[in-house]
Amino acid sequence: MIHLEKIDSTNIWEIVDLKVFKSQKSFVAANWVSIVQAYGVRDSATAAFPFAIYNDKRPVGFLMIGFNEAALYENWDDVEAPKSLVNNYSLWRLMIDKRYQKRGYGREAIKLALDFIRTWPCGKAEYCSLSYEPENEVARELYRSLGFMENGETDGDE
């Protein structure tokens, strides 16, 4: 059964070791990068919730949820950042290890992430956004099938 677990000292290295196919490396940051980013924003107006994705006791992927408070944007010059991120949640990262793709784990993990977001850990919000590389058709179709809609905003090249 698919479930999420917080990243901690007992599972960090097995999550860092998960990899995507070479052809997918440009679609998602390495898990260690995401974990460092989560650590780096812990004292800012951004919240990060990094999770390991497990199938029973086997680690199969990584997911990170973000939340950006309005204070983050008050003096921010990044004109490329979508305004829909203000006071809203985001599915910041999602990766399934190359050995476990095409088994429905990504879909189930997103559903669990949305359940977590509905607990409002940083307060209520209007949206949950995400971004993906335009070339990543598999991600686009997965997100659409779960009810996500494109709104025309971009986050850099995503």
How would you name each of these model-derived features?
Residues 2-99, 110-112, 116-122, 155:
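Acetyl-CoA-dependent GNAT
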Residues 87, 124-127, 143, 147-149:
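Non-catalytic interaction surface on structured domains
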Residues 97-103, 134-135:
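Active-site acidic-Proline motif in GNAT/NAT acetyltransferases
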Residues 107, 134-152:
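Conserved active-site alpha-helix within GNAT-family acetyltransferase domains
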Residues 124-140, 156-158:
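Conserved beta-strand-loop-alpha-helix junction that forms the acyl-donor binding cleft
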